[in-house]
Design a protein with these regions (language model features):
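Conserved alpha-helical substructure of the radical SAM core
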Residues: 1-74
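Radical SAM enzyme [4Fe-4S]-AdoMet core and its adjacent flexible, acidic
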Residues: 69-73, 80, 85-210
Length: 211
């Protein structure tokens, strides 16, 4: 396994990114909120547009206030379902309440919050996530297909993967509700649906491979 970089090593990486003219940094993982030095690293990256990708379970009120003070620009929280049982089944732990509390804490700290939902056959009621986001005052959402890669490349994960037709059927009511309520949804899985289908559903940004 590749050893984890310590604080000074990451600070050096951040400085190299600045010197190279990089404009955006995303803190992701794994789970970045497990690092004791996360606030310090975000603070050191203030001249970038900074984002945090997290499961939200460690987002205490104090951490969210500290992230806000460190000038974090946006936090994206992975949220699988508005139903606790389904969310917990997909993440493999009883983490729904912790994640929901993290969302509330991030919003209370006036962080720019978005929700990300990988879609599969178990959480096809994506509309309920969009409705919950609207209730919470969250206006930006992302979703994707379930990508069977790495540890997720199992027969079980491939069995719950949505077909293009199922994915379109899942997205249509969510997109209609979003359009009617001022919510922006981005689909981030390139190649999963034809461009004309995505545009017909109301997506204005078509995902492309960054390779």
């Amino acid at each position: 396994a590749v050893p984890e970089l310590d604080t000074d090593q990451w600070l050096a990486v951040i400085e190299k990114c600045r010197s190279a003219g990089v404009t955006q940094l995303t803190f992701t993982g794994g789970e970045p909120t497990l690092r004791h030095d996360l606030i310090k690293l975000v603070q050191a990256a203030q001249w970038f547009v900074t984002r945090l990708n997290t499961n939200g379970r460690m987002l205490t009120s104090m951490m969210c206030k500290d992230l806000r003070a460190a000038s974090l620009d946006a936090v994206q929280i992975t949220f699988y379902s508005a139903e606790a049982e389904i969310h917990n089944q997909l993440v493999g732990v009883d983490g729904y309440n912790d994640t929901l509390n993290g969302i509330h804490n991030a919003l209370a700290a006036d962080l720019n919050v978005s929700l990300n939902t990988p879609l599969c056959s178990l959480n096809r009621d994506y509309l309920s996530v969009v409705k919950l986001a609207h209730t919470l005052g969250i206006r930006y959402l992302t979703c994707s297909g379930l990508i069977p890669a790495g540890n997720a490349d199992t027969a079980a994960s491939r069995a719950v993967r949505l077909t293009p037709a199922e994915l379109e059927e899942t997205l249509r009511p969510a997109m209609e509700y979003a359009a009617a309520n001022g919510i922006e949804i981005s689909f981030t899985s390139p190649g999963w649906l034809p461009e004309d289908t995505l545009r017909a559903l109301g997506f204005t940004q078509i995902p492309s491979c960054g390779a």
